[in-house]
Amino acid sequence: MPLDNSFPLSQLSKVSERVLEIHLELLDTKSKLNDIYKDICELQRFTEQLINDDDLRESYVSSKPELSKNWEKLKKEIEQKHKEIQELISEFDNMFINSF
């Protein structure tokens, strides 16, 4: 696209700097979102293991006596949170695919 003659060339440097700043901000944001995504995936793996791995669950629950009292109720809550986490991961996947 050709430059409009009314656009002062002296401003081009400022515009270029601002574009670079925005680009760096976007990269930083993407990096932060990626870190959040990794944390969510780790939480998803943990909840999945907690639901499906009897030994891990037993070890985890036995280390926290208050959990063993209400394990069935807690298990249902964990399963629900696990589903919510999976939905969140899907949203992140779509966001990354469509935005970056």
UniProtKB/Swiss-Prot annotation:
Keywords: Coiled coil. It comes from Acidianus filamentous virus 2 (isolate Italy/Pozzuoli). This is Uncharacterized protein ORF100a. Residues 65-96 form a coiled coil.
